[in-house]
Amino acid sequence: IVVAADGSQEAVDGHAEVAFCLINVGAVRMYLGSSEPPHTLVRSRLLYDDELYNPSGSLISDGQVALRRDKEERTVLAQLAEVSDVPVITLTDGPVELWGAKSNGEEAAEFQEQLAAYKAALLELKRRGAIAAGYVDKPAANLVVRLLEVAMTPEIELPDMRQLRPLL
């Protein structure tokens, strides 16, 4: 079973007439080698009013929005992963480890709060026996698709793998 999630965000623009922020996360769960169709999920969250501001009254940063998106991606993966007799692999765009911790101030407090929720999602994946992986590559690359193609190809056909494209 492969479960993958990717997110995007529209950061708050302090100069816009209406201040808002949007976090989107899309996910898919596929049962390789099964006739069962993939299960998809899209979750969007609109942040506005008080959600856009730190306790001091300043707008949340782009980094804080990205952190919330990362946390939401892992939360969705934990929800879609299931305990199974076959391996469950979860994939996200980007590293598994969170970077960008601040040492003090409001962003540090936000980071610690989001990190706790992020770690809870990773612990839930572990409890369900899922393998969590992050992937970093250049835009428009299809190496993950190629990896899945290799993984699903019978061993006897691997010598011809350069000509085979079962997922395209």
What function would you assign to each model-found segment?
Residues 1, 62-89, 94-168:
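Long, contiguous domain-sized segments
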Residues 2-10:
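Two-metal-ion RNase H-like nuclease active-site motif
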Residues 10-56:
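Acidic, metal-ligating active-site segments
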Residues 58-60:
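Short glycine/proline- and acidic residue-enriched helix-loop micro-motifs
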